Amino acid sequence: MSGFLASLDPRRVQWGAAWYAMHSRILRTKPVESMLEGTGTTSAHGTKLAQVLTTVDLISLGVGSCVGTGMYVVSGLVAKEMAGPGVIVSFIIAAVASILSGVCYAEFGVRVPKTTGSAYTYSYVTVGEFVAFFIGWNLILEYLIGTAAGASALSSMFDSLANHSISRWMVDTVGTLNGLGKGEESYPDLLALVIAVIVTIIVALGVKNSVGFNNVLNVLNLAVWVFIMIAGLFFINGKYWAEGQFLPHGWSGVLQGAATCFYAFIGFDIIATTGEEAKNPNTSIPYAITASLVICLTAYVSVSMILTLMVPYYAIDTESPLMEMFVAHGFYAAKFVVAIGSVAGLTVSLLGSLFPMPRVIYAMAGDGLLFRFLAHVSSYTETPVVACIVSGFLAALLSLLVSLRDLIEMMSIGTLLAYTLVSVCVLLLRYQPESDIDGFVKFLSEEHTKKKEGILADCEKETCSPVSEGEEFSSPATNTCGAKNLPSLGDNEMLIGKSDKSAYNVNHPNYGTVDMTTGIEADESENIYLIKLKKLIGPRYYTMRIRLGLPGKMDRPTAATGHTVTICVLLLFILMFIFCSFIIFGSEYISGQSWWAILLVVLMMLLISVLVFVILQQPENPKKLPYMAPCLPFVPAFAMLVNIYLMLKLSTITWIRFAVWCFVGMLIYFGYGIWNSTLEISAREQALHQSTYQRYDVDDPFSVEEGFSYATEGESQEDWGGPAEDKGFYYQQMSDAKANSRTSSKAKSKSKHKQNSEALIANDELDCSPE
């Protein structure tokens, strides 16, 4: 019926084809083979990025991008206005939430190590082109605002050290810019403009130069941190933590402070953007992400302890808390020492925002989603110099015209959105069949690869010892190549995998879903948490798994289970969004203990738990990576919940500005990117190739009769017997009747050839029989 209606209305066919074409474009994914180890990534001008970053360099970048504003600004702000001395607990909660997203980032950094676009690249190869552009575009906004805010913060720091003489001179000489910032004294910050330009030049000069500069500032910041810890011990007073003063605003203040403290950990994703420039990204990226978060947590907690023990929480200065806490005790010289650390820390934070921004632009321009001239890599500095200059200029312009307070309000929404998407991608990929994640799972864990190579090498070194006949027949299992030196049964299982004969049965549900030669991945050493759980529960562990419907070790994901996980993750995201919205905007009904509000919260929590449990029941892909996020699906699901909650805590004006930025991005994507992406150009070339040359089916068995052309009745040899190259376009436009006639002729010739062959075989058998 639908075909009949379509034949009556050609516009229906046109709209359907247009929708299908647009749908396929926005959901197309980038093949990952070009980004795997050994392939390298080359810019549009043929120059590769330099691979010079070590694990220490990556840790330094991660720490520097976080610790500046967190230690010198956020600690005092949260302690005074939200949590009091409980800011320590707030930082710990925020760190746990950040680590949840960090482990997901670490797994993606191992899956696609040779990348420059962080969450943009991860989403491009998993979710699709449109979502990838959306995430990349908002990461650019995040880094752009972070750079401008860092330059403005440094300008304010210098102005504070100069007793605000710089700002007064600006207002008296240049004037104010009413409307661009909050307050009547908003002025064009020329000092912030100069700072942004200088840092842009440093980043554009080369990775090694900028990272070296970053390392020097981090060492200086570390020295100031040690000074604060030692000097502060002489002025601490335990009465400021007396009963009733540690949590002056209760646990609600601690949780509110945790939401603010979470922003102090934003920045570790810079590590994921440098994968192409890291010497060994497979191991460096996960280690650097974890280490940087732990170091930042240590710095924040220790500084918060000293701050709240030196000064009552209600007397903390929110603009420069660490400098003023020594002034309160008359130690004026320490103010300038801390000021040096503040300048170093804020400079590193500024560098941490500017460093990844041109690399995201470079990755998007290299894929054709942004203008391709932005992907130019300088052959001298081996950096995306055009992207550096353009992004640095925009950041400098923002720092000149927009106040620091307005910039800070938009700093987190893009990053939180990227964190959420990375958690979603981890959930999707771990439960998809192997055929759906081609390039991601083509390599094994380096540790197991080295272990296998060592076992095989040891086996080859052993010489074969002679064995007597008696030994050979009496012990058929004896190995003649030094069995005592061969690996144990567990090692053999690791090498060849346990045989699952049922999996080779065509009726087995997992038949054909995974390469049978890769049984090694399914029999890897189990997760340490599962081992502890087995010891705790005992034999009932397996009974419990069966009753809960959890998958077995040899179960493999199929297209059906992968689709189930995709639907569950989508519903989980929507339900979490509704749940967090109700918790935030309906808090008065919940606190008022309205029965319908409590019932709705319980119902949504129950539905979220059911969806997570359904995901848990699906089999995971058995491939192992050098680093994998633990405790799936709980860790990514909880990370999604925390990130969505923090996004909804942002102000309304932030969402409005975010919507305007997204609208500009959509104009660029649908006006330029979707038609000029590398995948679109490749698809056009492939379509042109298919329309120019006739494809032949080379899989059919060849017979002698097929080597010749037979003309059917009513059809001359001239019509189709000649070579295809001579027929050109008209050969491809052959009518269906002729094509069917030729197919029937070939089928008859094949049948005749088969009958002749069977007759010949029968005659040969008769000739060779003893009779």
Swiss-Prot record:
Positions bearing carbohydrate: N282, N676
Biased composition, class Basic residues, residue ranges: 745-754
Chief localization: membrane
Catalytic reactions on record: 4-aminobutanoate(in) = 4-aminobutanoate(out)
InterPro entries: AA/rel_permease1, CAT_C
Free-text function comment from the UniProt entry: Imports 4-aminobutanoate (GABA) into lysosomes. May act as a GABA sensor that regulates mTORC2-dependent INS signaling and gluconeogenesis. The transport mechanism and substrate selectivity remain to be elucidated.
One annotated GO biological process: gamma-aminobutyric acid import
Pfam families listed in its UniProt record: AA_permease_2, AA_permease_C
Signal peptide interval: none
Modified residue annotations for Phosphoserine: S465, S468, S475, S488, S757, S769
Family per similarity comment: Belongs to the amino acid-polyamine-organocation (APC) superfamily.
Domain of life of the organism encoding this protein: Eukaryota
Region ranges (Disordered): 735-771
Originating species: Mus musculus (Mouse)
Name assigned to this protein: Solute carrier family 7 member 14
A single MF term (Gene Ontology): gamma-aminobutyric acid transmembrane transporter activity
Induction comment from the UniProt entry of this chain: Up-regulated in liver in response to high-fat diet.
Summary of the knockout phenotype: Mutant mice exhibit slightly thinner retina, including outer retinal layer, and abnormal electroretinography at 2 and 6 months of age compared to wild-type animals. They are viable and fertile. They do not show any noticeable physical abnormalities.
Tissue and organ expression note: Expressed in retina, brain and spinal cord. In the retina, expressed in the inner nuclear layer and photoreceptor layer (at protein level). Expressed in liver, spleen, lung, kidney intestine and brain (at protein level).
